[in-house]
Amino acid sequence: GRPSARYDAPYCSQEEVRECDDDCSGNPVRDACQCAYDPAGSPACDCYCVEPWRR
């Protein structure tokens, strides 16, 4: 899964967030994007699509 639209600043780049938004905009149900830093310690930003009300 991928975490929240409250972007975790040092880890999620604007580009990643924008890409996620693009990916999710075509999704009929989960058309909102959530991004968050992976707490496992990986420097990656984790993004996924969620229902808009879950943001």
UniProtKB/Swiss-Prot annotation:
<keyword id="KW-0872">Ion channel impairing toxin</keyword>
<keyword id="KW-0800">Toxin</keyword>
<keyword id="KW-0528">Neurotoxin</keyword>
<dbReference type="GO" id="GO:0099106">
    <property type="term" value="F:ion channel regulator activity"/>
</dbReference>
<keyword id="KW-1015">Disulfide bond</keyword>
<feature type="propeptide">
    <location>
        <begin position="1"/>
        <end position="5"/>
    </location>
</feature>
<dbReference type="GO" id="GO:0090729">
    <property type="term" value="F:toxin activity"/>
</dbReference>
<keyword id="KW-0964">Secreted</keyword>
<protein>
    <recommendedName>
        <fullName>Conotoxin Cal22b</fullName>
    </recommendedName>
</protein>
<dbReference type="GO" id="GO:0005576">
    <property type="term" value="C:extracellular region"/>
</dbReference>
<comment type="function">
    <text>Probable neurotoxin with unknown target. Possibly targets ion channels.</text>
</comment>
